[in-house]
Amino acid sequence: MKASGTLREYKVVGRLLPSVKNPTPPLYRMRIFAPNHVVAKSRFWYFVSQLRKMKKANGETVYCGLVHEKTPLKVKNFGVWLRNDSRSGTHNMYREYRDLTTSAAVTQCYRDMGARHRARAHSIHIMKVQEIAANKCRRPAIKQFHDSKIKFPLPHRVLRRQHNPRFTTKRPNTFF
């Protein structure tokens, strides 16, 4: 899988094709993070074939739909449990991100894993993503933003006034 652009969250439901032996096969549902619905269905069959004796050739996709965030304007903390196949073996990881949506947090996770561990998207398996409360956060990089009296430094900027002369005898004041 190529994690191109921002990933989207899909709910994919699939099952084995009904047969004489098994007329009502059980449905399997997964949350898949993928750039589009084609990749989402492909990842679903990849994971299902690892977990159950199912293949796309003798199965069917019942539903594949986009999952929309309930509150996309509220900043939330997300815990991401993932499995990474690195050059030295398979590693389980827990990472925390702060973002507006679940899919944005997972996209951030893919970028972070690529930057810190040189992990390619195909070798990262997202196992669970959960919104976590502020008191349950473990990582100091996320906990630093849980201060109600948080202050950020003002940028040291030069204001370019449109009608002021370009050359003047006075130095610009950049402290506000």
Curated annotation (Swiss-Prot):
The UniProt record lists the keyword Transferase: no
Annotated localization: Cytoplasm
GO molecular function: structural constituent of ribosome
GO cellular component: cytoplasm; ribonucleoprotein complex; ribosome
Gene Ontology terms: biological process: translation
Source domain of life: Eukaryota
Any one Pfam family match given in the protein's UniProt record, by short name: Ribosomal_L18A
Alphabetical UniProt keywords: Cytoplasm, Ribonucleoprotein, Ribosomal protein
Primary residence: cytoplasm
Known function: Component of the large ribosomal subunit. The ribosome is a large ribonucleoprotein complex responsible for the synthesis of proteins in the cell.
Assembly and oligomerization: Component of the large ribosomal subunit.
Family: Belongs to the eukaryotic ribosomal protein eL20 family.
Protein name: Large ribosomal subunit protein eL20
Source organism of this protein record: Salmo salar
